[in-house]
Amino acid sequence: QGETVHVGGYLGYEGEAAFAGLFGAYQKSDFNSMRQVTAANTRPLTAQADIDMTGRTFGGFAGYRAPVGGGLVLAPMVGATNIRIKRDGFDETGADPLNLQVSEETREVTYGTAQLRLSTLTPVAGGTFEPYLAGGVERYWGDLASVSDMRFAGAAGDMGSFRIIGAPLEETVGVLGAGFDVRPNDRFEIGASAGSRIGERTTQTTVEMHARIRF
């Protein structure tokens, strides 16, 4: 169980052909962790802990729309995003001597993306409807694997210390997506999209909706 507060912002430019944007977000989370632990010949114990996490994201992108005939528009796009997540250290209680002491962990990842987007713009009821397909590649740098240093609180000295290393992010993945944008007028836009990131070891699928107001 826990609570998360998330705030963010977006600033964009839309020209006749060129477009660009900057975005950022901040997140603060507070979780209550509970897990059952059992040692030989003992009854199950419940270990509890309060876990605090903060994170921030910022990035930008730019692209250019080029008509290719037949009402189709091809838009090459590039972008970069930096993500930093910090989890405070914490001590479990309630399961002595099997309580864990977990050290602070900070993870920072940067990724760049290059994509091609093919779309068509259709006038609808005084506005426009723009479906699109997109494909490209993403490249990741930084702390690709999470590393957590832990120890059993009941152990003497450095005894009982160990390290858990999570499965690393893939350095390069392919990106595929499809979606649509609806613009009733020049100031308002709503849309939805679905996308997949495909690598040698992992596949991730997302569905998103958005609304934008231009000033």
Locations of regions flagged by a protein language model:
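Membrane translocator/pore-forming domains, dominated by Gram-negative outer-membrane beta-barrels
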Residues: 1-215
